[in-house]
Amino acid sequence: TPERISITANAVNATKGGMGMQYVVQTIARTLTELRGEKSPAKLSELVTIENRYNPTLNYRHYMIPALMIILFILICGFLPALSIVGEKESGTIEQINVTPISRFMFILSKLVPYWIIGLFVVTVAMLVARLVYGLAPVGSIVAIYFGALLFILTISGFSLTIANFSETMQQTMFVMFFFIMTFMLMSGLLTPIDSMPVWAQRFTLILPPRYFVEVLRSVYLKGTTIAELWTNYAALGTFALIFNILAALTYK
């Protein structure tokens, strides 16, 4: 009696995991057929045990929902702070603020704090919608999600304010933000796996903040990964947050 074969696929990305599983099964079938000297493919139902880890039903929504959450964070915590600053430039109220005795750091902080609060509220609502509408609940700790979300919100809001400091009109701000948002969506692993990209593109993703947050969300939601195991992602997001917020304060005029 032949030994049983166990095949386990990483099904976080349902499409990629399913295709990889089929390739492996077909390869095994052809190999067994050649070894037995048979013309028809061997029947693998009694020999092979197939297991899809992290996403047993191969539901593609489980892969996409975290990406949609991040896109929502970028639109709310990225677009709105930039438009707020540029809107005050166009209306002239920014000049009145500049003559007040507050420091640039306090002004930047006053612009960021409301969007930090809104962002954390959006995280809560997004998780509730994912649970109630799509039946997707995090396997890991919710604290890991909130910690990553806070760092990402700090990063994207500081990034948007930096862009606003170099923009003169709302139209200019929207065009620049749209360019970066499309780059984030296409190159950060939100919609397509980073592993399937060319080598140069994979290296380029290392400087894109959403890459690290989408790994946090998918790992916590589907794998149950802990905060300690995601420390490199948190460190990267914290570094981006520090750099962009310092740039936002230094470039403000």
How does the language model describe each region?
Residues 5-23, 86-98, 119-127, 176-192:
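Hydrophobic alpha-helical transmembrane segments
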Residues 51-132:
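Hydrophobic alpha-helical transmembrane segments of multi-pass membrane transport proteins
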Residues 1-80:
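Transport-system extracytoplasmic interface segments
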Residues 137-253:
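Membrane-spanning alpha-helical segments of multipass transporters and channels
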Residues 28, 70-74, 82, 86, ...:
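Residue-level hotspots within pore-lining transmembrane alpha-helices
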Residues 24, 81, 85, 94-97, ...:
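Hydrophobic alpha-helical interface/terminus motif in multipass membrane transporters
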